[in-house]
Amino acid sequence: MKKFARFIGIDDGYFVRNVHKKTKLIGAITKHTILDGVLSREITIDGDDVSEKIIDMIKNSNHYYQIRGIILYGITFAGFNIADVELIYKNLGLPIIIVMERPPKDIFYKAIEKYKPNGIELIKKAGPIYKTKTPFGYTYYQVYGIDKDTASNIINNLAIVSKIPEPARVAHMIARGVTKGDSSKPRAGGDSNPGPAG
């Protein structure tokens, strides 16, 4: 893919479980390092609507035909609202890269099995977890509709100031800023997930 192709990074906002029913889903479109657009929707805490919201958000955007790929900051959003990469790819035709700062621990899978009966099946659709070395450390990732080597090159091309590719990093900052009031606040409490979450 071209160095200056547009990608959309997607992450969720802050929430407190049992207090909030919904949180923001933010899509940040970048042309390499330049922010080119911002999209948003609301998703349900521990719900099942993140995939349809991602599809709706992108498909109804003027940026749709310019976007060359989707970078999800984790596969779980708003708690246990798990992205169905197969469904997203089928509807949008865009390759998907799921990035994580670290591989998930066993507690993540146990929680999914307990609270989301079809969750493991959705996660398995994204395939194995790979890792690629960036100037800022290893980025762990899954892919759908794209090969792992091409995805690795994209991650490294977009890892400008951290090991998280710029579209996903910017989406995370915007989501945190608009829902918590401060994009610099670390994950804590109800908005953190026990695994590769956004």
Swiss-Prot record:
UniProt-annotated stretches for the region Disordered: 179-198
PANTHER family: UPF0215 PROTEIN MJ1150 (PTHR39518:SF2)
Annotated protein name in UniProt: UPF0215 protein NEQ431
Species annotation: Nanoarchaeum equitans (strain Kin4-M)
Gene3D superfamilies registered for this protein in UniProt: archaeoglobus fulgidus dsm 4304 superfamily
Record-stated family: Belongs to the UPF0215 family.
InterPro entries: Endo_dU
Pfam families: DUF99
